[in-house]
A protein has these predicted regions:
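Conserved catalytic-core motifs of GNAT/GCN5-like acyltransferases
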Residues: 110-112, 127-145
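Conserved GNAT acetyl-CoA-binding A-motif
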Residues: 101-113
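Conserved acetyl-CoA pyrophosphate-binding loop and the N-cap/start of the following alpha-helix
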Residues: 84, 88-96
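A short beta-loop-alpha structural element at the N-terminal edge
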Residues: 2-16
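Conserved GNAT-fold acetyl-CoA-binding loop/helix
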Residues: 19-41
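Conserved beta-strand in the GNAT
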Residues: 59-67, 74-79
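Conserved beta-hairpin
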Residues: 50-62
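Conserved active-site tyrosine of GNAT-family acetyltransferases
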Residues: 121-122, 126
């Protein structure tokens, strides 16, 4: 198992990983179609954002992306293929993101969590600092904003 920098040619497989990981939570298929544009990445996205892939036998099984906003590091994506969830892959990616954020000189790492992932991020040492209201098909959704001091 290894972690490497994302390459421009990885966009399609990483889009598949993100879509599959989001679908793992049992969201309705029509919601998944609404979210598909947000889960589809262009090569240009990875040129502009620090992104890392975890691989098994040279096959990508997960990735994360960090962006800088307001002087803080933000995890914009952290996705693991469903068949690898619960095997420590997300933890390895998260710890790598923490390390990279420190190397970039950040003191705080934040993210907007899918409600289903809050427990995972709490185990990683993050805590809720706020929330963002969202909606899908007129139904309200609350997305927790979480952070960890680096």
């Amino acid at each position: 198992m290894s972690i490497r920098c994302t390459l421009l040619g990885d966009a399609e497989v990483l889009s598949h990983i993100a879509f599959s990981a989001k679908a793992y939570w049992g969201y309705p298929k029509h919601w998944m179609e609404i979210w598909k544009p947000q889960l589809t990445f262009s090569p240009g996205y990875f040129e502009k954002n620090e992104s890392w892939i975890i691989e098994v036998n040279n096959s990508p099984i997960g990735f994360y992306t960090i962006q800088e906003k307001d002087g803080n590091a933000w995890i914009e994506n952290l996705w693991v293929l469903p068949e690898y969830i619960g095997q420590g892959i997300g933890k390895r990616l998260f710890l790598h993101a923490v390390s990279r954020s420190r190397l970039m000189g950040h003191l705080i790492l934040r993210l907007e969590a899918d409600p289903n992932a809050v427990g995972f991020y709490k185990k990683m040492g993050m805590h809720k600092i706020g929330e963002r209201e969202s909606e899908i098909e007129g139904k309200p959704r609350i997305l927790p904003i979480m952070e960890i001091t680096l």
